Structures are given as C-alpha cells and as structure tokens.
Amino acid sequence: MLLYIVAWLTVRLVATVLFRLKVSGQHHIPRIGGVLIAANHASYLDIPILGCGMLRKASFMGRLDLFAGPAAWLMRHLGWIPIRRERVDRGGFDEAIRRIKAGGAVVIYPEGGRSEDGRLQPGKPGVGMIVAATGCPVVPAYLGGTHDALPPGAKRIRLRPIRVTYGAPMDFSALVKEMDGESKRKELYQRISQEIMGRIAALGGVASPSTACRSAGN
C-alpha cells in the first residue's frame, strides 16, 4: 500500500505541474465496495492519469506485453491485471471479477486498446461480462487531452492540458435480470458496453462511437 501511495503522490504532482491536471467527479467513486471504473483509452498516459485522479486504490486491466522485467514486477505490486489480447483471456477477466467481488476497485478500458485518432471507439463485450458476473456499479470516466499529450506512435510527450471527469455510477442490475438466459448473454454484454461508452461520450461532450459510425457512413 505504501508503494501505491508514493506512486499516486508522485504522478499527481507531476501531472498537475506538467499537464495542469483537472479532476472532477471523484465523489462518484464509492469509497468501499466492489466497483468497476470504465474509461476511454487514447494514450499510454491514461493509466497513471486516471489512477492519480481516484481517492482509492484500484487495479488496472492492461495488455500482457505492456510491461516486462522489473517494470512488470512493479506494476503487479501496484495492482496491474495483465490481459492477453490475442484471445479472450478468461484468467485475466476472472481475476478482475474476483477482486471486485472481494470489494476492490478495478479499471477497464472497454475499447480494448488505444484509439489511434483520439475519438471514442466501440466498446467490446468484456466489460459487460464483468458487470453481469459481479452485479457491481460502473463509474464511467472520460480522459481528455491525453491523446494530444502522447498519441500512439509519438516519441515524446507534449505539454497539453489534461482533464479527468468521473460520472455517476451506472446500475445494470435491472438489465441483467431482464436479459437473463444463455441465448441473450452476448447481446447483454454488448448492450452494457454500448451504454457505458455512450455515458463516457456524454461526460466528454464528444460523439459516441455509434453516432460517429453513423456519421461516417453518410
């Protein structure tokens, strides 16, 4: 826990000085109890920035090859949950479910990877699977400015303003009950994911993935 606190304070200080970090809506994150925080993903900065915006320790789901060697050891001690991207990683998702059921906070990026252009991408069904398995509330979060500061492929960080906005918890218990049954499971997962991405878009005042896709097709 001490390591996490030191890392949190360091990142918060650096982000405030370099990126003029602004955080709002932290009060929406429950102080205790299992919860899933779902955010958009457009930069390698998203993990540390989102983490230092929360007032409780959280475990972050991230791809397996993101860290190696000593860095991987450090991140595991900070709560990282490695996920294999080439296939559905039941082990990684089961670990996230276990931590939430144990009363922990877990962070997921529903898009499954960084957005190349900074715009929101359609969410994948994995987030829906976690919600259906745990019945936990979902706190949506929008990260603005991280793509401008460090987009995919960039060789250096640019000093751009960054903001993090957390929204009110989303409760999917009624939807899960309504769509109970094996035949509706995939549809349920995708619908949960879509609704979460829509709320993230609203927090950022940007187009939701479904709206953007329809606009591109016209």
Task: Label each residue range with its predicted role.
Residues 1-2, 64:
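Compositionally biased, charge-rich terminal segments
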Residues 2, 91-218:
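Non-catalytic C-terminal accessory region of glycerolipid acyltransferases
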Residues 7-8, 16-17, 29-88, 95:
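Catalytic core of membrane glycerolipid acyltransferases/transacylases, capturing the structured
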Residues 12, 48, 128-129:
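Active-site phosphate/pyrophosphate- and oxyanion-stabilizing loops and adjacent acidic/basic residues
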Residues 14-17, 199:
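Transmembrane alpha-helical segments that form the membrane-embedded catalytic/substrate-channel core
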Residues 16-24, 146-148:
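Short gly/ser/thr-rich secondary-structure transition/capping motifs
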Residues 23, 60, 80-82, 138, ...:
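Conserved beta-strand scaffold positions in the cores of enzyme catalytic domains, especially
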Residues 23, 28, 167-169:
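A short N-terminal beta-strand-loop micro-motif at the entrance of redox/enzyme domains
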